[in-house]
C-alpha cells in the first residue's frame, strides 16, 4: 500500500475532544479514526497509540497531547486529545492546539460532571467557537427517558455558558461498540462526522484576516527610512498601503513604501512570512519592539482585561510559593514584556502553583489586543504562567 499524497485541496479544520475524565474522550477519538478510515479511507489509530500522548512545549509549559488526523469526503481534520484534565486546561489556555470546534463527550451513564462544566467554561473563555455533543456509553442505558434527561441537562449547561444549547447537535452513541465494529454504533460515528462537516463552518484563513505584524526589530536605512521586521501574524500588507503602529505609545499612521524578504524586494508580505517593512515618515525612535503594525482601525491598544490564567506548578519550573493580590509580574505579549497588576476574584486570597484562575489584569502600557490573545506571565524572564485575554475591559 503506497502512502497517500497529502491533499491540500480540502479545507483543513482543527477539532478536539473535551469532557470529564473517563467519559470516553480517547475511545471516541480512536473510534472516529477507525470508522472513518474504514468508510472513507485513511489510517486508523488504536486507543493505546492515542493514550500515551507525547510531551510538547507551548509557551514554556509542558503539555501532553495526542494529535490524530482523519478525513471526511469534504474535509481534512486535525484532532487533539489530552490524557489528563490538567493537560486540557493548559492546552486551552496556551492555545497550543487552537480548536475551530470541540466535541464535548458526556457519558450517558453519569451525565454532566464537574470537569464537563469546567471544559465548557474554558471553551467559552478561550474562544472555542462551536461545540458538538457526543453522548457516550448509550449502549449501557436502556431507559430512553434517562437519555433525554441527560441531553436536556447538557443543553442547559451549554446555554448557561452562552453556547446555543438548544441548537447544538447531540449524537447518542457508544465509542466502544463502534470500535468493536457494531454497525448501528458505527453509524453514530458517521453521524458525528456529518455534524463536524456541517455545523462547524470552514475557518477563516490567517491570510484573509486584517493585516497584523508584531514588531521584533527596528532599524534605519540611510536615505530610505525606517524598517521594522517581524513575522506577519495575519493578513497581507501591500506596498503603498496605509498602516497603523499600535501599542505602548499613541497610535500613529504611516504608509508601507517597501516590503523585503531575504534582501529581495516584494510587492506584498503575507501571513507566515518573515519580512521587513519600510515605513514613510517614521523616525527610528518613534517605534519599538512590542508594538504592532496593523491595518488601520483593525486593532486597538488596551491596558485592562479579564483573563483566564494557568500558573505553573513547582515541578513545571514555576513558582514554589503562592502569590497574593498586589502581585506585579511581567505579561509577555507577542514580542515584549509589560508589567501589570492583578485583581483576583472575590473570595480568592491567594493563587497556588498549578492552579487555573480568572483574573483582571491592568498593564502599565497599552498593548494592541483582542479577545483571544495569548500571553505568558514571567518573573525576570522566567515563565511562571500562561494566559488568554477572555474579555477586553479598557
Swiss-Prot record:
Annotated spans, G3: 81-84
Stretches for region G2: 60-64
Residue segments, region G1: 19-26
Gene Ontology CC terms, in alphabetical order: cytosol
Binding site for GTP: 19-26, 81-85, 136-139
Location(s) in or outside the cell: Cytoplasm
Keywords: Cytoplasm, Elongation factor, GTP-binding, Hydrolase, Magnesium, Metal-binding, Nucleotide-binding, Protein biosynthesis
Swiss-Prot/TrEMBL catalytic activity: GTP + H2O = GDP + phosphate + H(+)
Domain tr-type G: start-end pairs: 10-204
PANTHER family per the UniProt record, alphabetical: ELONGATION FACTOR TU, MITOCHONDRIAL, ELONGATION FACTOR TU-RELATED
Job description of the protein: GTP hydrolase that promotes the GTP-dependent binding of aminoacyl-tRNA to the A-site of ribosomes during protein biosynthesis.
Subunit structure: Monomer.
Protein name per its UniProtKB record: Elongation factor Tu 2
Native source organism of the sequence: Yersinia enterocolitica serotype O:8 / biotype 1B (strain NCTC 13174 / 8081)
Amino acid at each position: 500500500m503506497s502512502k497517500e499524497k497529502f491533499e491540500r485541496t480540502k479545507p483543513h479544520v482543527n477539532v478536539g475532544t473535551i469532557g470529564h475524565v473517563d467519559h470516553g474522550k480517547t475511545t471516541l477519538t480512536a473510534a472516529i479514526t477507525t470508522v472513518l478510515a474504514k468508510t472513507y479511507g485513511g489510517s486508523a489509530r488504536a486507543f493505546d497509540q492515542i493514550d500515551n500522548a507525547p510531551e510538547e512545549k507551548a509557551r514554556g509549559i509542558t503539555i501532553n497531547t495526542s494529535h490524530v488526523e482523519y478525513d471526511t469526503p469534504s474535509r481534512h481534520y486535525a484532532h487533539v486529545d489530552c490524557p489528563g484534565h490538567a493537560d486540557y486546561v493548559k492546552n486551552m489556555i496556551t492555545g497550543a492546539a487552537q480548536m475551530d470546534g470541540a466535541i464535548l463527550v458526556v457519558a450517558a451513564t453519569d451525565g454532566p460532571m464537574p470537569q464537563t462544566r469546567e471544559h465548557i467554561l474554558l471553551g467559552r473563555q478561550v474562544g472555542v467557537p462551536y461545540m458538538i455533543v457526543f453522548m457516550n456509553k448509550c449502549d449501557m442505558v436502556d431507559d430512553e427517558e434517562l437519555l433525554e434527561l441527560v441531553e436536556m441537562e447538557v443543553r442547559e449547561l451549554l446555554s448557561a455558558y452562552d453556547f446555543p444549547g438548544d441548537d447544538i447537535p447531540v449524537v447518542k452513541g457508544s465509542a466502544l461498540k463502534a470500535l468493536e465494529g457494531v454497525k448501528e454504533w458505527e453509524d453514530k460515528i458517521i453521524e458525528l462526522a456529518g455534524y463536524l462537516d456541517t455545523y462547524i463552518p470552514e475557518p477563516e484563513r490567517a491570510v484573509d484576516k486584517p493585516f497584523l505584524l508584531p514588531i521584533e526589530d527596528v532599524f534605519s536605512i540611510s536615505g530610505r527610512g525606517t524598517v521594522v521586521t517581524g513575522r506577519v501574524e495575519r493578513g497581507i500588507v501591500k506596498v503603498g498601503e496605509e498602516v497603523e503602529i499600535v501599542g505602548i505609545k499613541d497610535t500613529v499612521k504611516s504608509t508601507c513604501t517597501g516590503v523585503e524578504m531575504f534582501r529581495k524586494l516584494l510587492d506584498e508580505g503575507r501571513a507566515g512570512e518573515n519580512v521587513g517593512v519600510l515605513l514613510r515618515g517614521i523616525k527610528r525612535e518613534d517605534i519599538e519592539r512590542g508594538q504592532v503594525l496593523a491595518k488601520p482601525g483593525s486593532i486597538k491598544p488596551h491596558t485592562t482585561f479579564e483573563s483566564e490564567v494557568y500558573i505553573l506548578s513547582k515541578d513545571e519550573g514555576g513558582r514554589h510559593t503562592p502569590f497574593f493580590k498586589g502581585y506585579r509580574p511581567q505579561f509577555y505579549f507577542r514580542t515584549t514584556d509589560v508589567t501589570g497588576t492583578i485583581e483576583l476574584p472575590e473570595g480568592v486570597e491567594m493563587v497556588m502553583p498549578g492552579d487555573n484562575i480568572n483574573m483582571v489584569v491592568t498593564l502599565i502600557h497599552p498593548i494592541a489586543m483582542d479577545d483571544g490573545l495569548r500571553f505568558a506571565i514571567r518573573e525576570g524572564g522566567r515563565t511562571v504562567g500562561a494566559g488568554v485575554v477572555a474579555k477586553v475591559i479598557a
